[in-house]
Amino acid sequence: MLRTMLKSKIHRATVTQADLHYVGSVTVDADLMDAADLLEGEQVTIVDVDNGARLVTYVITGERGSGVIGINGAAAHLIHPGDLVILIAYGMLDDAAARTYEPRVVFVDADNRVLDLGADPAFVPDTAELLSPR
């Protein structure tokens, strides 16, 4: 049996741009892609913290160090510049690997710079001003 597990997430990134007239996808700063172990073309789910919208798309590489989180194509109807989003990637693991796998969890600041990098999906950094689910 394979289990679909959290592979990585970028938590509470700020959308910097939205372009309705683009072929699709989400543009992500290459530094954030590295931190979250995302590859160009990899499927991600985007959750908009501000309005609850959820969608599935794929990642394209943005300029390194730019902080870009760009919503492209039809998704720009749902997610707008300034919105806070969570980008989530999942992986399929066999049962043994799923029980020991540690995801990449990336918290960012308002400029989409890495604040904290860890493996606990429920961890909340002190600077995040969020409630821990634990």
From Swiss-Prot:
Subcellular locations according to the entry: Cytoplasm
Principal cellular location given in the protein's record: cytoplasm
Intrachain disulfide bonds: none
Keywords: Autocatalytic cleavage, Cytoplasm, Decarboxylase, Lyase, Pantothenate biosynthesis, Pyruvate, Schiff base, Zymogen
Cofactor binding description: Binds 1 pyruvoyl group covalently per subunit.
EC number of this enzyme: 4.1.1.11
Modified residues (Pyruvic acid (Ser)): S25
Pathway given in the UniProt record: Cofactor biosynthesis; (R)-pantothenate biosynthesis; beta-alanine from L-aspartate: step 1/1
BP terms from Gene Ontology: alanine biosynthetic process; pantothenate biosynthetic process
Any one of the GO CC terms: cytosol
The reaction(s) this protein catalyses: L-aspartate + H(+) = beta-alanine + CO2
Top-level enzyme category: lyase
Subunit-structure text: Heterooctamer of four alpha and four beta subunits.
Family affiliation: Belongs to the PanD family.
Role this protein plays: Catalyzes the pyruvoyl-dependent decarboxylation of aspartate to produce beta-alanine.
Protein name listed in UniProt: Aspartate 1-decarboxylase
Organism, as annotated: Mycolicibacterium gilvum (strain PYR-GCK) (Mycobacterium gilvum (strain PYR-GCK))
